């Protein structure tokens, strides 16, 4: 080792600076006024602007001419109908037209066919496209059949049963007119809709072309027409070509009973197929090979055929036939030959054949009795609807059970509203109007499709035809309906006998109509209340206006009430003395008037006195001026006048003196005229004038009560001042009348 060598210094290159990573703020110019405006904007306002940007799609749809034309056609059709609920059907059609979005996550669907490609591209053509004039042209039964058959074509495409445009599925529309529905020749299974199906007759002539310009494959319909002509019970015929089915049709052993699906098919028929049916003899041979009972027909070296009394039953048999063929092909490939297979005994498995059963568990009612294939077909229709196909299938039984209410509506108050406010981008919600309409439609459809409780079940004897015997069975179980809990509002820990007794008492009160205002308050029960007005005897002129139930003490009287009932004995005694003093003063005045009359000349004619309504003139003409010696009497008489008031009449009307005065006050009747003309002296004018004078003085005093000391009146008038009681005036009026 060299001593001059020194420790080498290892130098490394300076670390290279990491490349600058562009950040968000590097792309933003902080001095940009647009950026400053957005930064200073309120969060709610910024969110509103973002929502407006998202809703531009709606404005684009509304401005498109195609949407306007479709909307106008819908509205015109609704105006022509006029019997549907206001706007409900039109709103539903508009919603169906606009909500064509497909969910991002699809349920698991069968692989194969063009439908898988369409779903991957996000394009799905609706099955039920009957709108406007198309929906009016068909009745309800034909609409449902069109939707079912079009959905069947979509299922065949999803399962991979289609072979371009050559397979056919047909259904019988009308037994009387022998009309059938078939797909237009040249249309793929993924393109079939309800309106595109063609209606033909038994000879293959087109009755209704549908919504396409395509024709019908006459040669392909020949097989279907032969089956329909031989089997009136058949409503649907399916003819498909699958690789597994073609392989089994080429085997000499045919379909082996090695799987439950093969045993569920029943008796399998075979026919040596020699190409397109053009001869009538070939049709007769097919009808003979199929027979009156078989549901499955295998065409040698060609394909598979299944028939059914409904679309659901035909689908059930063709599905099991395809599955059985696939099982057999794979089993033979692994086993090496049919000799190495274990075959099932059909006699043992016939009673245990796979048939759809009723669901077990708690439900709102008795479950429907499913026909063959209905339950499976309905489940697949639910899958298509979830994928966005809009099949229009009438479901017989809802998949989700509606929970029964545990409590009464009055116990649990409403806490939320039934309205949903969803944005346009949210496809998982719908408007409450559409939701309620769909719920009503589902309830109506479920009620229409529900079978009777004692429905007839058709079963054969010893494997014979199902039509040979009809057996009526009772409904399984009792119909249960959700009802309110008994004794819901009865308090806990109470004796049920007491509750029943109280209930019986309430019922008796309702029957006897014994209803009161309820219990009285005990707050003021010990307080004594002084009543100023005491109800006494009620005096009336008629008993008709008084209800005896509330006023038992009624006195009928033609005169007024007694005014002295409220006075004491002392007050009555003072009043009697005062009346006597007034009577003595009136007698003295009468004596003075007679003396003056005697002193007057006898040949002076008598002045006719006016009627009692003008007593003032009589007082001025006839009453002489009194002497000054009577001032003492006037002074003693004057203080007693204010005590007399018209509100306190006296009951002492029965004095004989007052009765004589009343007779003197009466006007002369016509019958007394001859007596007045007699030569006997008539001292009538003087007493009448003297009696009229006090009344005139009374009226003057009533008009001017403060004029006692006025200089215009003489002392004689003050002395003659006499106030007649009010009860005396009333008696005068009654006597005059």
Swiss-Prot record:
Biased composition (Basic residues): 715-737
GO terms, molecular function: actin binding; actin filament binding; cadherin binding; calmodulin binding; protein dimerization activity; protein heterodimerization activity; protein homodimerization activity; RNA binding
Positions bearing N-acetylmethionine: 1
Coiled-coil residue windows: none
Pro residues: compositionally biased ranges: 602-614
UniProt biased composition (Low complexity): 687-714
Membrane as UniProt keyword: yes
Stretches for region Interaction with calmodulin: 717-734
An example Gene Ontology CC term for this record: nucleoplasm
Pfam families: Aldolase_II (PF00596)
Gene Ontology biological-process entries: actin cytoskeleton organization; actin filament bundle assembly; barbed-end actin filament capping; cellular response to calcium ion; positive regulation of adherens junction organization; positive regulation of establishment of endothelial barrier; positive regulation of protein binding
Spans annotated as Disordered: 1-21, 421-486, 576-737
Consequence the record notes for mutating residue 480 to D: Abolishes phosphorylation by ROCK2
Membrane topology: Peripheral membrane protein
InterPro entries in the cross-refs: Aldolase-II_Adducin_sf, Aldolase_II/adducin_N, Aldolase_II/adducin_N_sf
Domain remark from Swiss-Prot or TrEMBL: Each subunit is comprised of three regions: a NH2-terminal protease-resistant globular head region, a short connecting subdomain, and a protease-sensitive tail region.
Family: Belongs to the aldolase class II family. Adducin subfamily.
Quaternary data: Heterodimer of an alpha and a beta subunit or an alpha and a gamma subunit.
NCBIfam families: PRK07044.1
PANTHER family according to UniProt: ADDUCIN, ALPHA-ADDUCIN
Record protein name field: Alpha-adducin
Organism of provenance: Homo sapiens
């Amino acid at each position: 080792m060299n001593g001059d060598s020194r420790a080498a210094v290892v130098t490394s290159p300076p670390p290279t600076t990491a490349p600058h990573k562009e950040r968000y703020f590097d792309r933003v110019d902080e001095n940009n006024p647009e950026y400053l405006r957005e930064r200073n904007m309120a969060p709610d306002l910024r969110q509103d602007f973002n929502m407006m940007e998202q809703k531009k799609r709606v404005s684009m749809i509304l401005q498109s001419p195609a949407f306007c034309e479709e909307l106008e056609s819908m509205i015109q059709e609704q105006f022509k109908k006029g019997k549907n609920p206001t706007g409900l059907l039109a709103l539903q059609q508009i919603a169906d037209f606009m909500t064509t979005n497909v969910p991002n996550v699809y349920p698991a669907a069968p692989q194969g066919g063009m439908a898988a490609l369409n779903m991957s591209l996000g394009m799905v053509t609706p099955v039920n496209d009957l709108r406007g004039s198309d929906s009016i042209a068909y009745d309800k039964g034909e609409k449902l059949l069109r939707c079912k058959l079009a959905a069947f074509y979509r299922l065949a495409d999803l399962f991979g049963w289609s072979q371009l445009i050559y397979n056919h599925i047909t259904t019988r529309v009308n037994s009387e007119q022998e009309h059938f529905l078939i797909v237009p020749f040249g249309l793929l299974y993924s393109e079939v809709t309800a309106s595109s199906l063609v209606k033909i007759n038994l000879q293959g002539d087109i009755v209704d072309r549908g919504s396409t310009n395509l024709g019908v494959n006459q040669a392909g319909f020949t097989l279907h027409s032969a089956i329909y002509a031989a089997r009136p019970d058949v409503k649907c015929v399916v003819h498909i070509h699958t690789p597994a089915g073609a392989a089994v049709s080429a085997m000499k052993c045919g379909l082996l009973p090695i799987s439950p699906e093969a045993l569920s098919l029943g008796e399998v028929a075979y026919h040596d197929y020699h190409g397109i049916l053009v001869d009538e003899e070939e049709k007769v041979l097919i009808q003979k090979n199929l027979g009156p009972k078989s549901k499955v027909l295998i065409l040698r070296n060609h394909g598979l055929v299944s028939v059914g009394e409904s679309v659901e039953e035909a689908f059930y048999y063709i599905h099991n036939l395809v599955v059985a063929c696939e099982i057999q092909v794979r089993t033979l490939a692994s086993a090496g030959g049919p000799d190495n297979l274990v075959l099932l005994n059909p006699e043992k498995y016939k009673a245990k054949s796979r048939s759809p059963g009723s669901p077990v568990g708690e439900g709102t009612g008795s479950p429907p009795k499913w026909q063959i294939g209905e339950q499976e077909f309905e489940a697949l229709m639910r899958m298509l609807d979830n994928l966005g196909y809009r099949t229009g299938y009438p479901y017989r039984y809802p998949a989700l059970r509606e929970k029964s209410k545990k409590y009464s509506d009055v116990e649990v108050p409403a806490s939320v509203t039934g309205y949903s406010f969803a944005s346009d981008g949210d496809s998982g919600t719908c408007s409450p109007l559409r939701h309620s309409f769909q719920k009503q439609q589902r309830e109506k459809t479920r009620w229409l499709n529900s079978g009777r409780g004692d429905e007839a079940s058709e079963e054969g004897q010893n494997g014979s035809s199902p039509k040979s015997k009809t057996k009526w069975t009772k409904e399984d179980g009792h119909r249960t309906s959700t009802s309110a809990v008994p004794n819901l509002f009865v308090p806990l820990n109470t004796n049920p006998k007491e509750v029943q007794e109280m209930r019986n008492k309430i019922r008796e009160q309702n029957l006897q109509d014994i209803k009161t205002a309820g219990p009285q308050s005990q707050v003021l029960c010990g307080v004594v209340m002084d009543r100023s007005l005491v109800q006494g005897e009620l005096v009336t002129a008629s008993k008709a206006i008084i209800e005896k139930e509330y006023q038992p003490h009624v006195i009928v009287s033609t005169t007024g009430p007694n005014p002295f009932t409220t006075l004491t004995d002392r007050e009555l005694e003072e009043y009697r003395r005062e009346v006597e003093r007034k009577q003595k003063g009136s007698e003295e005045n009468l004596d003075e008037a007679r003396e003056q009359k005697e002193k007057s000349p006898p040949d002076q004619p008598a002045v006719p006195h006016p009627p009692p309504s003008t007593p003032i003139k009589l007082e001025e003409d006839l009453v002489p001026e009194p002497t000054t010696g009577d001032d003492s009497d006037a002074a003693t008489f004057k203080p007693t006048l204010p005590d007399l008031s018209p509100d306190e009449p006296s009951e002492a009307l029965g004095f004989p003196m007052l009765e004589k005065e009343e007779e003197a006050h009466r006007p002369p009747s016509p019958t007394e005229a001859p007596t007045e003309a007699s030569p006997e002296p008539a001292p009538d004018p003087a007493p009448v004038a003297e009696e009229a004078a006090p009344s005139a003085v009374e009226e003057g005093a009533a008009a001017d009560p403060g004029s006692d000391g006025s200089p215009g009146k003489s002392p004689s008038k003050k002395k003659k001042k006499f106030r007649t009681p009010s009860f005396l005036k009333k008696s005068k009026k009654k006597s005059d009348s």
